[in-house]
């Protein structure tokens, strides 16, 4: 190679491959809640394939398993635990203020 052409070649940078989120021994099944819960957002939505870093086949199987778990009511359709807790706090504070004003 000429000396002028060698100057333009970049050295390849080393990068570390991440481990796949689903190991070969893991079964994608609606009963495997520990596996399924990793692929659901805080709101209860199914995370996208780009976020999960899954293959197309794995993402399809995960989606089917999540939908089966929702239908069999082992998984909620929407996760509103935070909102319910906040609402109960608000009603508790409102009732205490109502009682305080009535005592006068």
Swiss-Prot record:
Q: Which GO terms describe its molecular function?
A: small ribosomal subunit rRNA binding; structural constituent of ribosome
Q: Which SUPFAM superfamilies match?
A: Ribosomal protein S18
One GO CC term of this entry?
mitochondrial small ribosomal subunit
Where found, per UniProt?
Plastid, Chloroplast
Q: Name one GO biological process term.
A: translation
Tell me the keywords, alphabetical order. Chloroplast, Plastid, Ribonucleoprotein, Ribosomal protein, RNA-binding, rRNA-binding
Q: Which domain of life is it from?
A: Eukaryota
Q: Pfam families in the record, alphabetically?
A: Ribosomal_S18
Enumerate the InterPro entries for this protein.
Ribosomal_bS18, Ribosomal_bS18_CS, Ribosomal_bS18_sf
Describe its partners and assembly state: Part of the 30S ribosomal subunit.
Similarity remark: Belongs to the bacterial ribosomal protein bS18 family.
Q: What is this protein called?
A: Small ribosomal subunit protein bS18c
Q: Which organism is it from?
A: Lotus japonicus
Q: What is the lineage of its organism?
A: Eukaryota, Viridiplantae, Streptophyta, Embryophyta, Tracheophyta
